[in-house]
Design a protein with these regions (language model features):
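Asp-based, Mg2+/Mn2+-dependent phosphohydrolase catalytic module
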Residues: 1-25, 30-49, 56-84, 88-289
Length: 289
């Protein structure tokens, strides 16, 4: 068994080693239904001590739209400096393809991702490319539901922009599929996909630029940056590839893979890290000061 990172109950002793926190949102700060008060408190305290907290999310929405969702969940805006979303990255890609017709594969609630952009929507049969923000109805559908649609896209060699690389997220006590699941299925068919969000570099570049701006600095030393998240595939892999330390939250989407949310199976947890090729500096049940 590989060396397992320290299991910590409190973030405070670790916080002094870092100036910038790149914090995941869904699964760390809330579960889609309820905000996690201890996590919000930890962010508030980190900022009070001079730290900069950037929320980095694969939500397929502009950062301000994410902020409004957090408002409704009672996450205080004082808990973070700014938000960097895969939705913002996606908007940049769409803007660069002005004049091309796009098919939006995703629910109506994600339409704000296109607000203010000059674009032309088209049905799949005549579109030039696809922006995938999720399943049309993630409460009942799975990637299998989209087998025929993805095959039709592949037949036309349509390029896909994936606005949310997450495979699944928590919604209350349930797990629902995200755009990343459809994008991966399309790649398996030989389709061409651009992933906007974690674990890919552009969103980290944007987040670090936002952190530097918030601190009034030109850059932020990577050794003073810490990422916190509940996904090995996105949060930990992305941080490792960018040379950033990470803390893994066990109460998120991987919980059932290692014995539940309260008493993780250490060997199973170590196996998940080994399979992902990552080694977080610490593991915690939840972000708590």
């Amino acid at each position: 068994m590989n060396h397992l990172p320290d299991f910590i109950e409190h973030f405070e002793p670790l916080a002094q080693n870092y100036d910038v926190l790149l914090c995941d949102v869904w699964g760390v700060i809330h579960n889609g239904v309820t905000a996690f008060a201890p996590a919000c408190d930890a962010l508030l305290r980190f900022r009070k001590r001079g730290g900069t907290a950037v929320l980095v999310t694969n939500a397929p929405r502009p950062g301000e739209a994410v902020a409004r969702i957090l408002d409704r969940l009672a996450v205080p805006r004082q808990a973070y400096d700014t938000i960097t979303s895969s939705g913002d990255t996606t908007r940049g890609i769409v803007a660069s393809r002005r004049g091309q017709r796009l098919f939006h594969l995703g629910p109506e609630r994600d339409v704000p991702i296109f607000a203010g952009l000059e674009l032309t929507f088209a049905p799949l049969e005549t579109a030039d490319y696809v922006v995938c923000s999720g399943l049309f109805d993630d409460t009942v559908e799975t990637p299998e539901t989209y087998r025929d649609m993805l095959a039709a896209m592949r037949q036309r060699s349509l390029f896909m922009v994936c606005a949310n690389p997450d495979i699944m997220v928590e919604r209350g006590d349930a797990l629902v599929y995200c755009a990343g699941a459809l994008a991966d299925a399309y790649v398996a068919l030989g389709g061409d996909v651009l992933y906007c969000g974690k674990p890919h570099a552009p969103i980290y570049q944007a987040a670090l630029a936002a952190a530097a701006a918030a601190r009034g600095a030109a850059t932020v030393p990577l050794e003073r940056v810490l990422a916190i998240g509940d996904s090995v595939r996105t949060d930990l892999t992305g941080a490792a590839a960018f040379g950033i330390d990470s803390v893994f939250v066990t109460s998120g989407i991987h919980a059932e893979e290692y014995g539940g949310r309260h008493t993780p199976d250490i060997e199973a947890l170590d196996g998940i890290f080994a399979a992902g090729g990552v080694t977080p500096i610490a593991v915690t049940r939840g972000l708590k000061w």
